[in-house]
Amino acid sequence: MRRAALLLTIALPIAANADIVDIKWADGAFTHRASIAPKKFLEVCGKQKMGDVVGWTFNGSAAADFNIHYHIGKDVSYPENRKGVASAEGSLVAPLDQDYCWMWTNRSAQSLEMEVRLKQAKVEK
């Protein structure tokens, strides 16, 4: 019993510092704030349809590696990939129906704070 409690004490903080967050749109917008522990990541993921446009912006307290990616089988495609940036903005035009993830990796020895904002653009069909 003691061993199980000790393992939980060790495992829970590790899992809590590598976050995967589902995008929950509210009136076409999504905002998320998180602390990213050293050598951990934050990933914000959601389903987009081909042609959907999502404006994105983020501000961090320190530089992180950033990408937007999606998986097709074992292959990973990166519509956006930047190294060592504390803030950036842009837009994603979804090339196909897929789950897309915005991801930040903290390669430093210090925690960093991150604020992410996504906004769905209205697309004329």
Regions found by a protein language model. Give the residues of each.
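Hydrophobic h-region of N-terminal signal peptides that target proteins for export
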Residues: 9-17
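Positively charged n-region of N-terminal signal peptides that target proteins for export
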Residues: 1-4
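Acidic, Ser/Thr/Pro
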Residues: 18-125
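Short helix-onset patch at the extreme N-terminus, typifying the N->h transition
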Residues: 6-8, 61
